Amino acid sequence: MVSIGMVFSAGGAKGDPFHSGVIAAIAEHTGFDSRDAELVVGTSAGSFTATALRAGLSPIDAEARHLGRELSAEGTAIVERIVTPYAEPEVKRSLLPSAPRMTLNAMLPPWKIDPARFAYGLLPDGKRSGASIAARIDELLPDGWPKRPTWIVAVRTNDGRRIVFGRDDVTGTVGQATQASSAIPAFYTPVRIGDRSYVDGALHSSTNADLVATLGFDLVIVSSVKTATADARSWRSDPERAWFSNKLDNELAEIRSTGTPVIVIEPDDTQLALLASGERVDACAAGRLAAERVLATSDGAGLRSIVESTG
């Protein structure tokens, strides 16, 4: 039986639309339905895509939802499970550093300072609550955690450690995990689960693709909106994207060192221009175009071959 793992990156409001365009294009051009992935890994916005797939929303409906098109009867029934309105109410917060321990840990041996964790620990907590995210995802998945492997990445505030909900021995509903994974530092309040607090998994990496390195998949597909193709990166004009791209390169090297092939779908200059508009429809189009560009190469032929071998 052929096994495919899928990784969905962080990306803010552009993330889920981009990923939806990617998976819709993959479905149309190769016949692979991302709902059939053996494992889905979601970081921040990518956790929305991962949970929607595990709820049964098809790639075509996922894209249609962002484009304002009519969904299938099945897709409509799934989306209508959500009854909680989306809201981001402001809450009182302290202006003291949110996680000084994390800042300290970022400077400890082996003396390779992690600038993201270092900076976050000095910032105050965010002042917006993302509680409606947890409620909505729990409504989308009323039976709780999906039966098929679903990993959602967050960062624990007290020590800066990466935590993988759905894999690690930690508590929390799938909705709480998604809220934690997308709790953007200094914007959203950290998410308290049990006696620990968590924030956005992108604080560690926008992709966290290295999590699948040793799992022995026949193929890994990474949809990454926060990185860019090598010719579209610039430390001068967009250091954050260059930073995340460098992190992803290292993760890909780790995966490939095990002999696992990887398909990476990320924006080039054309798609970056679309993403710059901030519109969901443009982010969706960017994801579709990025996927179609990659699928036109030998990577696409390889994926089609794998899909056909399972048919």
List each model region and its residues:
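Patatin-like phospholipase
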Residues: M1-T43, F48-G311
